[in-house]
């Protein structure tokens, strides 16, 4: 899971190039302010926070050394501010996805983890569920008392490889907010976790020179020439090719939206060569026919 040359394309370069934020024993006022900003950014999913919404009492306790970073994280995650942003308006499975992302820096590994937190929330309430993340061995081993939680894109002992791919269904770029995504309150991983499958990584739109393609949520790609009765091409297979950044003579230099074409299998190689000659980039190739 190490991030190398693909970091900028995946939108994780800022995290790859920075160190975890820690409040050391001899911290200054500026150090405390930096930690407070980092906690708000992480736990509130990079959502904008007004000055009147800040938890001034908890901030003072942290600045005075009365509470640790872990307890400040706990206070923010249990606050009415957090509930208004992520609990009240979301399905519970989406809330669990966000709790994993905000507090443990990863995506859920399996449906069992989601079921565990669903049961805990139903039987003991939201605060107890938040405690289960922050009091976990996983949290303590990775962040301890004074490190601000961060997105864990690198492999660690006990991690599962599915976590890397699924994290990019939750993380949509450094400047993205968890409350400003197109899919809004719907769960990102419920289908994958229920079917025990993993989808391909689709990078943030800003790093792909346009919106990257995502297949239908229903998963019902039409068969045989996009639903027709007559197969198109010998193999009866069609592919949707999404193209971006064509820069050949005659094309305007202003930024353009992506272009998608439907190509039969036997013409796919020829089409890719033509795109390359025009200076374009292939954003995605996905089946448009199931037969």
UniProtKB/Swiss-Prot annotation:
It is a peripheral membrane protein. Belongs to the phycobilisome linker protein family. The lineage of its organism: Bacteria, Bacillati, Cyanobacteriota, Cyanophyceae, Synechococcales. Residues 2-179 form the PBS-linker domain. The keyword Membrane applies. It comes from Synechocystis sp. (strain ATCC 27184 / PCC 6803 / Kazusa). It is found in: Cellular thylakoid membrane. Part of 2 PBS rod complexes, the conventional CpcG-PBS rod and a photosystem I-specific CpcL-PBS rod, both of which include ferredoxin--NADP reductase (petH). CpcG-PBS has on average 3 stacked phycocyanin hexamers (PC, CpcA and CpcB). Linker CpcG connects the PC stack to the thylakoid, the hexamers are linked by 1 copy of CpcC1, 1 copy of CpcC2 and the stack is terminated by a single copy of CpcD. The CpcL-PBS has on average 5 stacked phycocyanin hexamers (PC, CpcA and CpcB). This is Phycobilisome 32.1 kDa linker polypeptide, phycocyanin-associated, rod 1.
């Amino acid at each position: 899971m190490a991030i190398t040359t693909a970091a900028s394309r995946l939108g994780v370069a800022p995290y790859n190039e920075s160190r975890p934020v820690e409040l050391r024993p001899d911290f200054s006022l500026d150090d405390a302010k930096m930690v407070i900003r980092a906690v708000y950014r992480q736990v509130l999913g990079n959502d904008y926070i007004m000055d009147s919404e800040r938890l001034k009492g908890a901030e003072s306790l942290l600045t005075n050394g009365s509470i640790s970073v872990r307890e400040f994280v706990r206070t923010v995650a249990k606050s009415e501010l957090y509930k208004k942003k992520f609990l009240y308006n979301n399905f519970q499975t989406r809330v669990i996805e966000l709790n994993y992302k905000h507090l443990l820096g990863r995506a859920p590994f399996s449906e069992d983890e989601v079921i565990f937190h669903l049961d805990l929330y139903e039987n003991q309430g939201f605060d107890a569920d938040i405690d289960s993340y922050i009091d976990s061995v996983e949290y303590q081993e990775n962040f301890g008392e004074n490190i601000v939680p961060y997105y864990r894109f690198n492999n660690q002992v006990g991690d599962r490889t599915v976590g890397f791919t699924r994290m990019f269904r939750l993380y949509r770029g450094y400047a993205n907010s968890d409350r400003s995504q197109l899919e809004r309150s719907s769960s990102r991983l419920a289908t994958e976790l229920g079917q025990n499958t993993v989808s391909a990584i689709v990078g943030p739109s800003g790093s792909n020179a346009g919106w990257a393609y995502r297949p239908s949520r229903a998963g019902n790609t039409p068969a045989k020439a996009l639903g027709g009765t007559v197969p198109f091409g010998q193999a009866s297979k069609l592919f949707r090719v999404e193209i971006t950044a064509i820069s050949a003579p005659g094309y305007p230099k202003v930024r353009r939206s992506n272009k998608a074409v439907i190509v039969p299998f036997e013409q796919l190689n020829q089409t890719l060569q033509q795109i390359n000659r025009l200076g374009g980039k292939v954003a995605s190739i996905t089946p448009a026919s199931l037969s």
